[in-house]
């Protein structure tokens, strides 16, 4: 039944997006939405600092006139996913409800303190200097230094909206132990080793109706064979499956359909982050949008290790 409802909603939103005029005037600071031009600027910034992300065009017939032909959407491929969400030990302490007083019952962040369970996310820190412009340290160094550095726990909605938003995470874990454990299982030929070798292709598009970025993902098994929808749902927080995350057609690519993180809350979350930075005497530039965006969607896909940006500190 939920799939039918999502399908109807998806078709209605396609019509609504078609009829929605392109946003021309910046409303980033006021509402958290962005124009297509701002999306491109934020995408250029992401590509510059995280070269694993690249611009793409997609199908020629699906090119959007309000975006440059060669910058229709962003893509990063072969992103590792070593664990299923159900393999993350559940505890009431790990669950937080974001915006519980809204009409939809709030956004449930099931893994907002994943460091407790020993799950390490490959995330570095973004430095947000108080009363100064934002400085981003190049995250591409991860490719050369990931074996030498400790990596902080995953960022999430709870940190941004309810716990000071931009505080430094103290907990760090040695990821080499996790890698060694995975290798040991692989050498033993255990079934668990197969489950821990999935990869995902991730895409970021511009949603003209919601006027925000939108994340899409499609997964593959260890043989690079496409995962079924049910298997991809295993890598998504179960509180978001068929709610925040639905199966829809990519706006720039041919079928099969992909998992998509619904963008209806993105502008609201971004607006709160902007306000928090301003309260600390700083200013959040629109070029940082996608780097922050990739942070708060980790609550939805906590085991997909795509986010190589840095945490925020005030």
Swiss-Prot record:
The residues responsible for catalysis, as annotated, are: 264
Q: Tell me the impact of changing residue 271 to R.
A: Does not affect ATG12 conjugation
Question: Pfam family of this protein, just one?
Answer: Autophagy_act_C
Q: Name one GO molecular function term.
A: Atg8-family ligase activity
Per its UniProt entry, what is the enzyme's top EC class, as one word? Answer: transferase
> What processes does the entry annotate via GO biological process terms?
autophagosome assembly; autophagy; macroautophagy; mitochondrial fragmentation involved in apoptotic process; negative regulation of phagocytosis; protein modification process; protein transport; protein ubiquitination
Gene Ontology CC annotation, any one:
cytosol
Posttranslational modification = Conjugated to ATG12 at Lys-243. ATG12-conjugation plays a role in regulation of mitochondrial homeostasis and cell death, while it is not involved in PE-conjugation to ATG8-like proteins and autophagy. Cleaved by CASP8 upon death ligand binding such as tumor necrosis factor-alpha. CASP8 cleavage blocks survival-related autophagy and favors apoptosis.
Residue positions where N-acetylmethionine is found in the record: 1
Start and end residues of each stretch annotated as Disordered = 143-165
Consequence when changing residue 11 to W:
Rescues MAP1LC3B lipidation when transfected in cell lacking ATG3
Q: Site feature Cleavage: at which residues?
A: 169-170
Q: What triggers its expression? A: ATG3 protein translation is increased by EIF5A.
Positions of short motif Caspase cleavage motif LETD: 166-169
Region Interaction with ATG12, as annotated, extends over: 140-170
Q: Per the UniProt record, which EC number(s) apply here?
A: 2.3.2.-
Position of the Glycyl lysine isopeptide (Lys-Gly) (interchain with G-Cter in ATG12) cross-link: 243
Q: Where is this motif: Membrane-curvature-sensing motif?
A: 4-19
What UniProt keywords are attached to this protein's entry? Acetylation, Autophagy, Cytoplasm, Isopeptide bond, Protein transport, Transferase, Transport, Ubl conjugation, Ubl conjugation pathway
Motif location (Increases ATG3 translation efficiency by the ribomome assisted of EIF5A)?
Answer: 101-103
Location relative to the cell: Cytoplasm
Question: What happens on changing residue 83 to R?
Answer: Does not affect ATG12 conjugation
State what changing residue 243 to R does.
Abolishes ATG12 conjugation, leading to an expansion in mitochondrial mass and fragmented mitochondrial morphology. Does not affect PE-conjugation to ATG8-like proteins. Reduces autophagosome maturation
According to the record, what happens upon gene knockout?
A: Homozygous mice lacking the Atg3 gene are at Mendelian frequency, their body weightis lower than expected and they die within 1 d after birth.
Outline what the protein does. E2 conjugating enzyme that catalyzes the covalent conjugation of the C-terminal Gly of ATG8-like proteins (GABARAP, GABARAPL1, GABARAPL2 or MAP1LC3A) to the amino group of phosphatidylethanolamine (PE)-containing lipids in the membrane resulting in membrane-bound ATG8-like proteins which is one of the key steps in the development of autophagic isolation membranes during autophagosome formation. Cycles back and forth between binding to ATG7 for loading with the ATG8-like proteins and binding to E3 enzyme, composed of ATG12, ATG5 and ATG16L1 to promote ATG8-like proteins lipidation.
Protein name per the record:
Ubiquitin-like-conjugating enzyme ATG3
Which taxonomic lineage does the organism of this UniProt entry have? Eukaryota, Metazoa, Chordata, Craniata, Vertebrata
Gene encoding the protein: Atg3
